[in-house]
């Protein structure tokens, strides 16, 4: 398999969701920092890149301490990537508003009764922006879509690498981590009982902070990031629920996107009271 290349062809109408020029720039940036495979060429509806040795992980793997430590270290490495220029702005709100507008203008008349009304979604989006913007989570370079199959583990080298940079870009640190924690539940058979328990999260966050700082993390730093991450995990549910509604309308993939959207919205409203009760350490 060492002489293999991968060719990825873009899905139907995915330009509604993904900036393909930005994806290529992200690919090249990550490659320059040793975090991505070689990109050989791009074409109008896809790209060709180096095959990365290893196995794609599943929900049963990413909760193993030896593996989640490697994932935390790799995320910390990516989060330290900087580009020259002005201070970056988070992509979260721009993308979320864009997705919401698509749902509101093009999909709303055909929405299932199981999906919250557009007026409710608009109120929740405004609340998320107001509440989360006050948490002072640093804006860093993020993967933004760290589900299990986007993590490749090479047991011979003892490291993990992340793949698929469609949604990568500058964003809130806590969003990237919270989004990954949500992915412990899986995609095809979603089970939020697998969401990492507090002790697992604290250990994961300790690994991450110590890799980022190059020094021991204080209990306050870990607790602060824990609160930020679980609050931003709410935004992750909302983001991918909107995304799934758009995919349900346009995608030709055999996947029940509407069901997935309903699951993510349901989990959003279920955990919102618990998240609201989390206090930021003084």
Language-model features: where?
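ATP-binding pocket architecture of kinase catalytic cores
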Residues: 1-121, 127, 131-138, 156-157
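Active-site acidic catalytic loop and adjacent metal/ATP-binding pocket
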Residues: 1-7, 125-181, 186-188
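A broad detector of short, well-ordered amphipathic alpha-helices
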Residues: 21, 239-242, 259
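A general structural signal marking secondary-structure boundaries and capping sites
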Residues: 75, 79-86, 107, 132, ...
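Surface-exposed helix-capping loop/turn segments at secondary-structure junctions
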Residues: 80-89, 135-138, 214-220, 250-252, ...
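Active-site activation/catalytic loop segments of kinase-like enzymes and analogous catalytic loops
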Residues: 174-216, 234-252, 267
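All-alpha amphipathic helical-bundle segments outside canonical DNA-binding/catalytic cores
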Residues: 217-233
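Regulatory N- and C-terminal appendages and interdomain linkers associated
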Residues: 247, 251-282
């Amino acid at each position: 398999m060492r002489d293999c290349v991968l060719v990825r062809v873009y899905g139907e109408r995915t330009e509604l969701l993904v900036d393909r020029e930005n994806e290529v720039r992200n690919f090249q940036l990550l490659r320059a920092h040793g975090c991505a495979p070689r990109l050989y060429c791009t074409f109008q509806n896809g790209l060709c890149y180096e095959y990365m040795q290893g196995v794609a992980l599943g929900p049963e793997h990413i909760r193993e301490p030896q593996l989640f430590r490697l994932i935390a270290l790799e995320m910390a490495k990516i989060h330290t990537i900087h580009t020259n220029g002005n201070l970056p702005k988070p992509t979260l709100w721009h993308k979320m508003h864009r997705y919401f507008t698509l749902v509101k203008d093009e999909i709303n008349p055909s929405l299932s009764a199981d999906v919250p009304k557009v007026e409710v979604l608009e109120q929740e989006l405004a609340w998320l922006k107001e509440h989360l913007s006050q948490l002072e989570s640093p804006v860093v370079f993020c993967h933004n879509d760290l589900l299990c199959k986007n993590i490749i583990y090479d047991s011979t080298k003892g490291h993990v690498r992340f793949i698929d940079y469609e949604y990568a870009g500058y964003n809130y640190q806590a969003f990237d981590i919270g989004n990954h924690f949500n992915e412990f539940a899986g995609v095809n058979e979603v089970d939020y009982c697998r969401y990492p328990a507090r002790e697992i999260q604290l250990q994961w966050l300790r690994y991450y902070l110590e890799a980022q700082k190059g020094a021991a993390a204080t209990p306050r730093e870990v607790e602060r990031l824990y609160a930020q991450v679980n609050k931003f995990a709410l935004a992750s549910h909302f983001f991918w629920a909107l995304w799934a509604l758009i995919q349900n309308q346009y995608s030709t993939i055999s996947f029940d996107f509407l069901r997935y959207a309903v699951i993510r919205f349901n989990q959003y409203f279920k955990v919102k009271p618990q998240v609201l009760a989390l206090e930021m350490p003084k």
